Amino acid sequence: HSLGTVNRVMQELTELQYVTEGEITGAGISALEPYRAKRAIFIAAGFGSRLVPITFNTPKPLVRVHGQRIIDGLIDACLDAGINEIYIVRGYLAEQFDQLLYKYPMIRFLENPVYNEANNISSAMVARYMLSNAYVFEADLLISNPQIIKKYHYTSDFLAIKKDRTDDWCFTVKDGVIVEEKVGGLDCWQMVGISYWNEEDGHKLSDDIKMTYEQPGGKERYWEQVPLVFCQKHYKV
């Protein structure tokens, strides 16, 4: 932004008493509260077939890479961003996730009893009432830059990587909004399994996930297909 724009905005914020001498005030922090990320949900119920035979005995998020469990990096990034309300949806070898409580006693577990009968929409069903002001993570992601997890969000969004070509799940984006989700594409954005949902969209997702899940074939869906495909008109992500 231009210096003139920055100065004008700072003047407006000062007049509103949100900023004083370049520092945010208590009133400013209160004004930001509706946009604060309040919780994180980790989808961790699946088998992790791509890491067989390691996952025969260990859920994929608990596999250690360079001595650290995969999920630890994600949880630490959330805590660093001030997100302390953390839910883990577990299913396969569920009891093994109890070990996380020694390091992260704030964790709450959500049980997915049908993880081996349905796709990951079944995990979203279990967590559907926690989706407002919430991050949703695939729990088996390694991140190199924890600062990608932000404390404040003004809209719902998906994290993605710009690609000239990919064979993976990706988005087509038009005017900053996802208009298509597909497998493989050119000049697209590759999904990375991290999204954020504001309060309004989180409430809509709660209803739309349930509706989609209960339709014929609904249990075979991926949860993110709900806002991006089946109920796309309800969202602007």
Q: For the regions a protein language model found, what residue spans apply to each?
A:
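A short, conserved structural fragment
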Residues: T14-E23
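Conserved beta-loop-beta/alpha segment of the NTase-like Rossmann-fold superfamily
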Residues: D98-W169
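N-terminal glycine-rich phosphate-binding loop and ensuing alpha1 helix
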Residues: S30-R90, A94-F97
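Conserved beta-strand segments of alpha/beta enzyme cores
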Residues: P61, M106-R108, K236
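Conserved core of the sugar-phosphate nucleotidyltransferase
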Residues: N145-G217
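Short amphipathic alpha-helical interaction segments
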Residues: S2-E12
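Phosphate- and divalent-cation-binding pockets in alpha/beta enzyme and binding domains
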Residues: R50, G73, Q96-Q99, V126, ...
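Conserved alpha/beta core of the MobA/IspD/sugar-nucleotide pyrophosphorylase nucleotidyltransferase superfamily
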Residues: E23, I29-A40, Q190-V237
